[in-house]
């Protein structure tokens, strides 16, 4: 399928035919055409030496068999164009961890190079990476030499080496090393990615750090506080005794959540130092050892720069309302896995234990109903009126104004046709529910209120992403996630019946209706559109299954006139 991409001027410095066969096979099984092209341009031409930071927690407890399985993944990643730099964090078994990491890299058919410290602190308090000062990184990369960085800092003022006390500061300084092109940051552990209450404590699929970091940090802080306080269900003696009996489990649970917090902080700090295209992945050692490229989160992310499944797919529901009790158990009744070998994790699904993270893109939400000269720039004269109703403003974006030139530009480019701006503004002005802007108008969603005054519904009128960014940075997922959170009860949109994106839309909806069907007796019109409906599954069972509701929505959506220049 992708063989033609290796022709027509594309140069790839292959080690042998096996390398080419591996890459083609993997691309066929995992990547879209756009993803394959992006991967080949970036990694497979041999012109750049990309690296990933690899942090493996508790590697000292891993068995020989576990190391063998993981080494296959590291070897595949090297074949596919990216080399590891291994980092250890403080523990009581540093020497054992060094030996295990050395063994892992050797099994990967690479050459380990143990560095006694990672940073050097100068007399003025500044830090410098040893890899930047003491290594020829290009030489190391081309010869398969892999640094293993011990968690120590050399202090020039005392001529001594000390164990790091702040892992986040340590990784912050290491990731600033400009001599290495760090494009990925992988954390492997026992418990997997950052837990999500919306997914029954399975891992977040994707985190846009610029948007979600503070909220997730608060959630983890609250969870840790709940565990630390150790509050019984009641003052009853049996409930208090149960806490005492389960103390060891509670201690393990507390350590696990503190590790999740540190992982989040590490990712936020490191990715902030790297390019906007850099990606982080947190997953289990077992998932990272999968021989299947379609479910191995590390290999899959290298090839596609995304998670194994989309983060905007329907979520699991946690009906208990308890942050660690999807089955109605109390927080201290949750099972805690402390085994580390892979036999205890057989059947583990990579989807549930993996979080992909990016530094992310800025998001602006404009929730005013009217576009006016006070909240919009480049507004046509006939719309330049002043409204003093406070509801027309979004306080969170009071310092920003909507730029209609950029607004129109992204819609024109995304749809491949020209928007009739005056016609469009006449249609939506006064009915705007929200306008979501991603980055510098790299993605946009325009939502309006449609229907009768006493029963309005939210309609996704326009959804656009700049063509060269479609499928990248998770922009579509970010928009749909935010849209569904803002309007959880119901959102409706329409799409041409032959739109190639309809499969993606179908996966995110709970109902689809052909708008050319007979909506009422004798009410049938030609239409090239399908209607998609998304709603909260619990409330939708009552409202959406009622076909009358769908038909009412469909009549309004069917009759919306397009606003394209003819």
UniProtKB/Swiss-Prot annotation:
<dbReference type="InterPro" id="IPR011190">
    <property type="entry name" value="GlcNAc_Synth_fun"/>
</dbReference>
<dbReference type="GO" id="GO:0006526">
    <property type="term" value="P:L-arginine biosynthetic process"/>
</dbReference>
<dbReference type="Pfam" id="PF04768">
    <property type="entry name" value="NAT"/>
</dbReference>
<keyword id="KW-0028">Amino-acid biosynthesis</keyword>
<comment type="pathway">
    <text>Amino-acid biosynthesis; L-arginine biosynthesis; N(2)-acetyl-L-ornithine from L-glutamate: step 1/4.</text>
</comment>
<comment type="function">
    <text>N-acetylglutamate synthase involved in arginine biosynthesis.</text>
</comment>
<dbReference type="GO" id="GO:0106098">
    <property type="term" value="C:NAGS/NAGK complex"/>
</dbReference>
<keyword id="KW-0808">Transferase</keyword>
<dbReference type="GO" id="GO:0004042">
    <property type="term" value="F:L-glutamate N-acetyltransferase activity"/>
</dbReference>
<comment type="similarity">
    <text>Belongs to the acetyltransferase family.</text>
</comment>
<keyword id="KW-0496">Mitochondrion</keyword>
<keyword id="KW-0809">Transit peptide</keyword>
<dbReference type="GO" id="GO:0006592">
    <property type="term" value="P:ornithine biosynthetic process"/>
</dbReference>
<keyword id="KW-0012">Acyltransferase</keyword>
<dbReference type="InterPro" id="IPR006855">
    <property type="entry name" value="Vertebrate-like_GNAT_dom"/>
</dbReference>
<feature type="domain" description="N-acetyltransferase">
    <location>
        <begin position="391"/>
        <end position="557"/>
    </location>
</feature>
<protein>
    <recommendedName>
        <fullName>Amino-acid acetyltransferase, mitochondrial</fullName>
        <ecNumber>2.3.1.1</ecNumber>
    </recommendedName>
</protein>
């Amino acid at each position: 399928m992708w063989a033609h991409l290796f022709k027509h001027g594309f140069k790839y410095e292959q080690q042998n035919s096996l390398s080419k066969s591996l890459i083609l096979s993997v691309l066929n099984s995992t990547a879209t055409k756009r993803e394959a092209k992006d991967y080949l341009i970036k990694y497979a031409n041999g012109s750049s030496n990309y690296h990933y930071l690899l942090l493996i927690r508790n590697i000292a407890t891993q068995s020989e068999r576990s190391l063998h399985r993981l080494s296959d993944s590291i070897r595949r990643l090297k074949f596919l164009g990216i080399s590891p730099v291994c980092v250890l964090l403080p523990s009581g078994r540093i020497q054992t961890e060094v030996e295990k990491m050395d063994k892992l890299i050797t099994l990967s058919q690479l050459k380990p190079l143990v560095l006694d410290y990672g940073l050097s602190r100068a007399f003025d308090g500044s830090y410098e990476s040893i890899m930047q000062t003491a290594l020829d990184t290009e030489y190391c990369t081309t010869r398969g030499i892999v640094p293993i960085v011990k968690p120590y800092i050399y202090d020039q003022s005392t001529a001594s080496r000390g164990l790091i006390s702040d892992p986040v500061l340590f990784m912050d300084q290491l990731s600033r090393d400009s001599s290495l092109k760090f494009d990925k940051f992988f954390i492997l552990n026992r418990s997997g990615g950052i837990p999500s209450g919306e997914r029954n404590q399975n891992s977040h699929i994707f985190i846009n750090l610029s948007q979600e970091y503070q909220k997730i940090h608060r959630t983890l802080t609250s969870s840790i506080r709940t565990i630390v306080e150790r509050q019984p269900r009641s003052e009853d003696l049996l409930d208090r005794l149960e806490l005492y009996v389960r103390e060891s489990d509670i201690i393990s649970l507390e350590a696990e959540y503190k590790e999740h917090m540190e992982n989040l902080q590490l990712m936020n700090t490191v990715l902030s130092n790297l390019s906007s295209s850099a990606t982080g992945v947190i997953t289990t050692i077992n998932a990272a050892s999968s021989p299947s490229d379609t479910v191995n989160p590390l290999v899959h992310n290298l090839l596609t720069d995304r998670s194994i499944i989309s983060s905007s797919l329907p979520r699991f529901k946690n009906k208990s309302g308890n942050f660690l009790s999807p089955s109605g158990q109390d927080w201290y009744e949750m099972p805690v896995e402390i085994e580390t070998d892979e036999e205890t994790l057989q059947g583990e699904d990579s989807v549930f234990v993996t979080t992909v993270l990016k530094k992310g893109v800025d998001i602006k939400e404009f929730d005013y109903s009217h576009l006016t000269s006070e909240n919009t720039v480049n507004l046509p004269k006939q719309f330049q009126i002043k409204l003093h109703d406070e509801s027309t403003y979004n306080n969170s974006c009071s310092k920003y104004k909507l730029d209609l030139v950029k607004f129109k530009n992204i819609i024109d480019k995304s749809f491949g046709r020209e928007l009739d701006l005056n016609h469009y503004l006449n249609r939506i002005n006064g009915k705007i529910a929200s306008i979501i802007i991603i980055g510098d108008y790299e993605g946009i969603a325009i939502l309006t209120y449609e229907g009768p005054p006493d029963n309005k519904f939210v309609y996704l009128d326009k959804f656009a992403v700049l063509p060269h960014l479609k499928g990248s940075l998770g922009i579509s997922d970010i928009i749909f996630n935010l849209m569904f959170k803002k309007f959880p009860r119901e959102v409706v949109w329409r799409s041409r019946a032959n739109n190639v994106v309809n499969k993606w839309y179908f996966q995110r909806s709970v109902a689809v209706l052909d708008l050319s069907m007979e909506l009422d007796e004798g009410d049938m019109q030609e239409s090239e559109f399908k209607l998609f409906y998304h709603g909260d599954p619990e409330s939708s069972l009552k409202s959406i299954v009622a076909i009358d509701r769908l038909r009412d929505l469909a009549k309004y959506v069917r009759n919306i006139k397009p606003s394209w220049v003819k």
